[in-house]
Regions:
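N-terminal start-of-chain detector that recognizes signal peptides
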Residues: 53-55, 104, 111-117, 214-215, ...
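A broad, structural surface signal
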Residues: 108, 112-123, 132-136, 212-217, ...
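Generic structural hydrophobic/aromatic packing signal, biased to beta-strands
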Residues: 114, 142, 157, 270, ...
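Extended, helix-rich architectural segments
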Residues: 1-190
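Long amphipathic alpha-helical segments
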Residues: 70-88, 93-103, 291-398
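Structured, contiguous alpha/beta core segments that scaffold functional sites
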Residues: 12, 136, 144-305
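Residue-level detector of alpha-helical recognition elements and their boundaries
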Residues: 129, 285, 357-358
Length: 398
């Protein structure tokens, strides 16, 4: 199998495309800060960085609500999202119209088998994570094999598309411990001039290079500039295990845009107002007694007096310090209520047709799909074309 990389290693090719991704990566992190900070943290190293919790939870609720609605529509539980049919005209042309019922029965058997495979897999759990990345960052990469569905966030892959939006090239970056690599490959690495024994004690970067050639995708993996043996792969484009998704499509751009990005202004305003209200309320809750230094009542007398005690003094010498900002707080609360209502509408957190139940009917699934389509201006249609159809074809191919 031949790969044309113009003399570049997969690592070099990855680094050359990272710059084109930087803008989208930065926007994704900004959106994650005010929704679910742990989803796309500032640091992508192996150590867990300290994450700052937002003062409001509307953003997180919105992302989870919208992701859940997409999940229930794209992969509804105990409900097939597809129906296999055969072209009746083709049967008539071949004079086999009498086999229609028998063929339909066979197709129902295939449908049930596919649906059962989906139910027992981890696909729904992985897809929910992927949908949250789509809502926040607008981009996610899925890898579907018989072992399950793997999710690559935006920080772990780069890609190129043509003007129409077809995927031309994908590179992923992962880390792996050297002991997980083939022993003969490790021996090959040790023979290199730039071999560092200390570095080989830590996790190593592995790059996967996926490239489209005509109607096929081919791929291989690389580590330390060397191709890893037995990592070659090939598949037809329509049944590829690599499913690259975007939320909001922009013509001519390799990456999509996140839904949160469109409402980030409201979320930032809500965050600032909630911080002011919370900090102001904490200051208002603090009780301080002021004592007239020229009066007959002494501060020490009050400080040492237990509850219900009788002490000598004058009430006029004592006052309670008040912030006096209740009017300002009420204005902020009104603005918070207005913004919250707008965001709840935008993220479909208002009353919906979906019941709080483990199973939903086909009618409810159709109503949710219609709600998503009407509210999100065709974004649901993009996901049906870029996820449901490739996912189903890949599942049938497996």
């Amino acid at each position: 199998m031949e790969y044309s990389t113009q003399g570049q290693t997969a690592a070099g090719r990855y680094e050359s495309l990272v710059g084109l991704r930087s803008t989208y990566d930065r926007e994704a992190k900004e959106s994650s800060k005010i929704t679910i900070p742990s989803l796309i943290p500032e640091s992508t190293t192996g150590t867990r960085a300290k994450i700052k919790t937002p003062f409001q939870a509307v953003g997180a609720r919105g992302v989870n609500s919208l992701s859940n609605k997409f999940l229930m529509t794209l992969l509804p539980p105990d409900q097939a999202f597809f129906k296999l049919t055969i072209d009746s005209l083709e049967l008539i042309k071949e004079g086999q119209e009498g086999l229609q019922s028998e063929i339909d029965k066979g197709l129902r058997t295939i449908e049930n088998a596919l649906q059962n495979d989906i139910e027992i897999s981890n696909d729904r759990v992985a897809l929910f994570e992927a949908l949250k990345h789509l809502v926040v960052s607008g981009n996610v990469l899925l890898y579907l094999t018989d072992k399950g569905l793997k999710v690559y966030p935006l920080s772990k892959f780069v890609c190129r598309r043509d003007e129409v939006g077809n995927v031309l090239e994908i590179l992923t970056k992962e880390t792996i411990h050297p002991q997980a690599l083939p022993s003969d490959f490790l021996e090959q690495i040790k023979k290199k001039d730039n071999y560092d024994a200390q570095e080989m004690q830590n996790d190593l970067d592995i790059y996967t290079h996926i490239k489209r050639i005509n109607d096929e995708f081919i791929w291989y993996q690389e580590c330390k500039g060397e191709k890893i043996p037995n990592t070659d792969g090939r598949s037809q484009a329509d049944v590829s295990p690599w499913i690259l998704l975007r939320f909001i499509r922009i013509d001519g751009e390799d990456y999509g845009r996140g839904y949160v990005e469109e409402y980030r202004g409201d979320l930032i305003t809500l965050e600032a107002l909630m911080q002011a209200i919370i900090e102001g309320a904490a200051a208002s809750a603090k009780v301080l007694f002021l004592v007239n230094p020229n009066g007959v009542t002494r501060a020490a007398t009050l400080a040492k007096a237990p509850n219900g005690a009788i002490r000598e003094g004058t009430a006029a010498d004592i006052s309670v310090m008040q912030v006096g900002k209740s009017g300002d707080f009420s204005v902020a609360q009104v603005v918070i209520g207005t913004i919250t209502q707008r965001l709840e509408t935008a993220f479909l957190m208002a009353k919906s047709v979906q019941r709080d139940a483990e199973r939903v009917t086909a009618a409810e699934v159709n109503l949710m799909a219609q709600e998503l389509e009407n509210s999100l201006g065709g974004i649901y249609s993009i996901l049906t074309q870029e996820f449901q159809l490739p996912y189903l074809k890949r599942r049938m191919h497996m």
